[in-house]
Each structure stands twice: as C-alpha cells, then as structure tokens.
C-alpha cells in the first residue's frame, strides 16, 4: 500500500473515532433555541440540531425518526405518549429543594386588585400555551372542577369555546388565531418564541404589561425583585404572597421531561451524552436574552434519570391524568357498561374469570367483565389507566397499588364466624417459615440454605422474611444469604434457580419463574410444593397452607403429604409443630384485599357484595364458586376466603396495612432494588402522591 494512501486512511479512521458513531438529534422550536443548540453541538459533538415550528411538530419528527429528543412540559408529555406518537419520558428536570422534580402551578395577579379565583369571570387572562400544564391544563381543569367554569363537555362545545366566553379576552398561544383566546397576544399566537407572550415569562409579561389581569404560570416565574408587586390567587378565594406557593397553588405537577422513542439504547445514549457535556451550561439562556427557558427551564439544577419502563401515564400520575381527561371529557374503555372489569393474571385465572362473567349475567347484562395481563403489576397498570377496575392482591401488592394511587375496597375474611358481623375484627393471617421435620434447619442456621418464596414483593413470601433478614444482616444482597431459591417475579432475574417449568402446556417454558399460576412454585401452595418436592430447605408462606395441602387435602401432588412431617421455625425458637403458628411466626399481616381507583370504590363494593350473595361460600347459586379453584390454587381469590368484607370508606393503603407492616416495608425499602419498577415509577415524584 502506498504511504500517502495509508496516511489518508489513518486520518479518516482517526476522524471517525473522534466523532460519536451516533449523534443525539435535538429538536428545537425557535431561532433562539437553534442558536443555543448549535452552540451545544459545537461544544459537544454528541449533539446535532433539528428545527421545527412547534412542540407538536417536534413530537411528530421524533416519531418519524427525524429527531431524537425534546424537553416538554407535562401536557406535552401526555400528548407525546398517545398511541399515535408512542413516545415516553426518560429524563426529568430537577429544580432543587424548592420543588425537586415537581413544580407548583399558580395563578398570579397584581397586588392592589381585589378579585379572587371565584371572581375570574370577565377578567383578562394570560396563559403559557394551549395544552401546557401550568398555563392551561391545571388552571382550566381546576376552574371546571370547582364549577367556576361551567362546561357540559365536548358534546356541547369545545372547552376552548367555553373558556373564551368565560374570560373577557385572553392570550393562549396555540389557540385558533383570530379567536378571543388570541386577542391579547402580541405576535402570531403560536406556541413558539414567535409569540412574545408564549411560555412562563411571556405569560408573566402579559400580566406585567397590563394586557391581562391574571397569569397562569409556575411558582418560580415571578422575578425576585418583582414579587412584592404581585399576589397568588388561592383555591379558597383568598390571596397570598408569591413565596407562599406551597400553601396557595392550583396543583403540584411533574417537572418537564425529555421524551424520545421507546428505545433503551437511544435513551442511554441521550443520558450519557447529556452527562458528558463540558464547558457549556445546559440550564442557562442568558447568552440568548431576552429569550428564556431554551431547551431546558432555566431553573433546572440537574437532570434525573427516570426508572425504566416509565411511560407518560406513570410519569404524570393519576391525579394529573384525571385533570387532562376532565378537559377532554374522555370516555374510558367500556364506560357504556355498568360491569366491573376484573383483571386476571395468566391463563388459569382468565378461564375462571370468564366463567364468573358468564354466570354473572342477569337480564342479558354481565355484572363482571374480564381483562387479563401477564402479571399483577400489569394488572395494576390497567386499573390505573381505567382499562380494568379491580383485582384481589396480597399485602405487598396493596402497598405497591397504594403507592400508585389505588385504594383497598374489600378484604378477604378467612373466619366464617366473622362474616356475619359488620365492622368486626379485621381479617389477618400469620407469615411463617416452614421446614421439613428433622431437617436440622433453624432460623439461626438459615444462611446458606435454599429458599422457596411465594413471589417477589409478596407479604408472607418475601417482604416479611426478607425484611427480618435485612434487619439482621443490613445487607441488601440477599443472594449472599440464600444463594439459591425460587422467588417468582414479573421479570425473572435473581432467585430463579429452583423454579420449575410451567405445568400448563399453553404457557411453555416462558412461564418459568414468572409471578403467575402457570409457574408451579408460584404463590402459597407453590412455595410449599417447592419445599415438599425437595427443591428448597425452607418455605415462606401463610400459616394455613400446610394444612390445606396435606393429610389428603389439596391437589394431586399433595395427596400423600403428611402435616406432621413439617415444622415451623422462627427467631429465638427451635422447630415447633405447625399448629403453634400463633407463638412461632414472623408477623401477623393483613389479609388480601381488592384494590381499585378511589372514584370506583363504591361501585366495586356494591357489585362484589351482590356477587358473593350468589357465588360466595354460602351463596344461593351453586353453578359457580367464587372462592374455589378447579384448575389451580387461589385463583382470583384465596381458596380459604369465606367472604369479602368492605374496607371502610376513606381508608388509605397505609392505614389498611397497619403501622407494623409499614415499618417492615420502610426497613426493606432501604434496599432500593426491592422496589418493583412500577413502584419506582409511581413514587419517583413526591407530587404523584395525593
């Protein structure tokens, strides 16, 4: 090879190595943003810039692959997550101690004016933009929910039309040009920097310059030197100083977030590229004055990576999604039906649910309809999204459901004598550790043994025993304590070595270690079977399981088992007979409960009370048994259930679980890996909690 050609090739190779193989194509919406983005690209070759006319155009470009990312507010996170775009948030802005990854939506008026929030009819309003969180979704949703704006719904007229008759005039960038919603605007009324009154500072300037009477912005918008001239409008019709935003606000909402395709590799590229930026301030727009909040909000202190699998719904939270739906008057799936949509996990539960649905029909109408999902977590997501209404879950799953805004509606009762008393003793059970008799296994020598668990995140099978073990060891790596085990989970990873292939041919090997009935060692009976068949040395289950699966009871695999061949172990005691669970247990824990959305609670209770009069333990219709399982164990409800009892209205998930259980969970959650992806997504923002 000639030396000149070789040098040329080496030069090309060096250039190729110096430039990232894939650049992050950032979408911008104005000339000023393009300037800042170009400066970023010059400072960091990991970026390139794509200019579009609006946020929606950027979302469409990302969907089409023309761009990779853009930072948007909550309203646009919602839009980006719709099926026709299918983008999801991967990184959130963090605003520091004043609000972390949330901010407050506030209504601001000039000091000296006297109107309150209930006196806004006929006033002139300034908004950050149509469909944006602080400037539109939250204030208009709040005014509608408080019946200040009286809107019958989209069947009557669009909400924009109702708002235009409520306010004397407005500037709502993104509204129809020439309408009253654009009357106060200074430029083209677009949702871009071409409109001087666009975004937070634009809406504030609309108020400051006297165009409007009220501005809907975020709590950090009013400059420090101007705060004494303005006041906040509170929901109780009073006013407060600007710095009292924590007590006087319309809502606390999730921070702006970066959205992109559902591509983990691209998400990681965006994250690492942003973190590698040097000699460039991502969160400052001073060099591009008077423009502000270019690419990122100027108040951003840092960026925070979101939990994996966070979608727009989980990021925004149920409360915010409810506000957006109220503005769109969205109908959830199946709302024309009065049936409760029950969520079943796996094939066996779905088959039982279908039978229940058929038997629930009266006057050609089913009281129960069935939805299904591959795991409890996926069912909980469906309930949150109104694709399903209810399901019965164990205490650990009540904890996760509660963190995601769901509430307990009814609880399983295992004592028939207590079924006839209303408001009687709450149902509970004992979490126990079971070993084979004469195995020599005790609580004190448990380390290094093989373990059988009902499932990751379950109460008796995981949360209680592993919480106890963490209290002893202060080590979050539980594989050091139990090097081998079976602990079924939605996404099998650790603790799967002892799990077995699925019994049901329909599921194949894919069900191995999955948290659903097709995994033979899943659930209470499954964990006991893991011990009985010699796979494990200890099973963490509830106190009734041995009796339900020995001495001729239970399914075929259990028929030859004897209860006397098993013992309980607990801290500070040698092995004791199974019958001594009251004195040798790991904890007394609340029974399984039916969870649902707060607004659906009364309907779920009403339907289930009727259903158990027909199909309960002493029901009038023998054609179907709600608390029996023919092709498995504990399908939909625990087989030991005698009745369902109402959980008092207003009971939160932590009140239901009790202080002891919550303390155990607080201890266990010191190990961050013990929280599921769903729980992490639901608790990422403090503002997601109502």
Curated annotation (Swiss-Prot):
Gene Ontology molecular functions: metal ion binding
Residues that, per the record, bind Fe(3+) 2: 394, 429, 524, 592
One Pfam family here: Transferrin
Ligand binding (hydrogencarbonate 2): 454, 458, 460-461
Binding site residues for hydrogencarbonate 1: 128, 132, 134-135
This protein's UniProt keywords: Disulfide bond, Ion transport, Iron, Iron transport, Metal-binding, Repeat, Secreted, Signal, Transport
The species this protein was found in: Oryzias latipes (Japanese rice fish)
Protein residues bound to Fe(3+) 1: 73, 103, 200, 256
Start and end residues of each Transferrin-like domain: 24-329, 340-670
Cystine residue pairs: 27-49, 126-206, 171-185, 234-248, 343-379, 353-370, 404-682, 419-643, 452-530, 476-671, 486-499, 496-513, 570-584
SUPFAM superfamilies linked: Periplasmic binding protein-like II
Entry's family note: Belongs to the transferrin family.
Signal peptide: 1-17
GO cellular component: early endosome; extracellular space; plasma membrane; recycling endosome
Subcellular location: Secreted
GO biological process entries: antibacterial humoral response; iron ion transport
Name of protein: Serotransferrin
Assembly information from the UniProt record: Monomer.
InterPro entries, per the entry: Transferrin, Transferrin-like_dom, Transferrin_Fe_BS
Chief localisation class: secreted
Entry function: Transferrins are iron binding transport proteins which can bind two Fe(3+) ions in association with the binding of an anion, usually bicarbonate.
